[in-house]
Amino acid sequence: MHITILGRQPALGIAELEQLYGADNVRWFSQQTALVDSPDFDFETLGGSQKAGRVVLEIDRGNWLTASRQIVQHYTAKWRAIEHKITLGISAYGFKISPRDVQKTGLLIKKKLRDSGTSLRLIPNPEIALNTAASHHNKLGLSPTKVELLVVRAPNNRIIIAESVGAQNITALAARDQARPRTDAFVGMLPPKLARMMINLSGDTKPGRLWDPFCGTGTVLQEARLKGIDVYGSDLSQKMVDYATENMQWLDNKYQINPQWQVFQADATAVKLNAAQKSEITRIVCEAYLGQPFSAPPKPAKLTAVRGNCNHIISQFLANIRPQINPSTTLVVAVPAWRDHSGKFTHLPLIDQLADLGYRRLHLNLVSDEQLLYYRENQVVAREILLLKPLDEN
């Protein structure tokens, strides 16, 4: 059993877990965490979880003092005879305590181990939970002597203590975002971890190719290939095709990976797939046209115009590819939703007209459709994630 510390938007993180491991094997533990019961659990492949840990202790009801006593008892016994120096970080979630309380637990372990001849370095806690950067840079969870304890309390006071298996590799994610040869802020910057989440939302790795018909600079293509998936990418702009090609070649050289790729120029609303592409494509993952960016909510007339334009382009795209794709194809499409001053969202009309376009929306068990929105607090244009399947022909 593993527990994951979900990202800034927990609903997206648990949706990703449900699609990878099945609703029967995933459940909410608290508002920020999920439990995963699967032998196939692989934290490295996730985009929507900041950290994960293997569950080692469970307490039916308790507070920090209860958890602290168990931790001190368990780990002083476990590490008493270890010759190597231990690096320890402790992160608490769901407790109303101070960072000093967390540090006291670590210092108590350190003192008891010192008495038995074992050396321990304790990572300081500016907050009650170490941030992802601190966990990652200290390599916590990546070896038996670099340990982070994730101590999580649920609203019903149940407590889980887990040993981290790693934190999100923010260095590699940043490199794939910023260090690649070509980026273009004008066309929008799809974060690599969101691209990874969207790929995972299309389901576990299966035969066939992934196609991104709005590939831009190639972020989805890169993340898919790192998961071992063969890809097609296309874009209306030849400049984007050139940029994506250059980025894919950079990825080949940096990571020495094998999955095949092909990038070509095509208008998603009019593209005609060849026979090989039709037979090979089993999933479509893309960020569709989001319209112009806004720094403040637009006036109603402007919003109506932009919304209508985006709706037209994305509807044309979906209608164009429907007769060309396999009925078993899974689509994960990011479309725009606009947030007003009160936090209310305006959605595309096509979301209520999917059947007319030949699609049905996939509904998840652990989150509602309305929760599949990705945005930052200051953003007007959010990305709404649509999980789609073609309607059966008959």
Predicted ranges, named:
Residues 1-75, 94-108, 132-148, 153-394:
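Class I S-adenosyl-L-methionine-dependent methyltransferase catalytic core
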Residues 84-87, 207:
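Phosphate-coordination loops involved in phosphoryl transfer and adenosine-cofactor binding
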